[in-house]
Amino acid sequence: VRSRRQRQMCIRDRRIARWAHQVGAVVVVDASQAVPQMPVNVTELGADLLAFTGHKMLGPTGIGILWGRYDLLDDLPPFLGGGEMIEVVHMTGSTYAKPPHRFEAGTPPITQLAALGVAADYLDGVGMAAIAQREHQLAALMLEGLGSVPGVHILGPTDATARTGTVSFTVDGVHPHDAMSIMDGRGVAVRGGHHCARPLHERLGIQSSLRASSYLYTTEAEIDRLVESVDHARNFFVGGTRS
């Protein structure tokens, strides 16, 4: 499963990993969008390596997690040098520690580790299935509300159960950066740009898009305010409001 950054659709097809393994490929999963929002089972996915970041799951910035098959990690060389990643050092050579220490050189980010652990415990207490259900509820509200604004085009599935609580969209006649500025003035934070997915935007025939992200703490009233601010931005630049 992977929740794509831009179109926010959930890809759960186990065949992808099987096809990759049939030709000897290593399956690397970027799960930064998925892990905070739904149950993820690395074994069921068929992943060889899976990575995600801390700041998308209520944790701090500057820290992430890499899970990997031990046999694969054991074959990989270190990418940084420093304390803890060395086993034995001689003038003529050295050997490296076993994973995970081989990949954790130097002083670890102690405060970030502690904070990420607390965040993970909190999410585990809430329950990932419950979070996924809440994400679907919020997505449904956003899709319905944004769909009522003239000129708004949703990117990705319009079925809330097929996506997360993040919705990307465009507004006819309004550049995302302009809409973002107007909405910011009304206390609504969205992202405008290509969201690290420029090739996808080119594929869709658009230069950039807006992205509204919700999470378990988002309220229905905040979704209503988002929709109202999008409608206001469109009216500001091209005129016309929702009926």
Model segments located where?
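Catalytic PLP-binding core of fold-type I/II PLP enzymes
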Residues: 12-48
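Single conserved hydrophobic/aromatic residue that forms the stacking wall/gate
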Residues: 1-11
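Alpha-helical scaffolding segments of alpha/beta enzyme cores, especially the outer helices
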Residues: 15-18, 22, 118, 137, ...
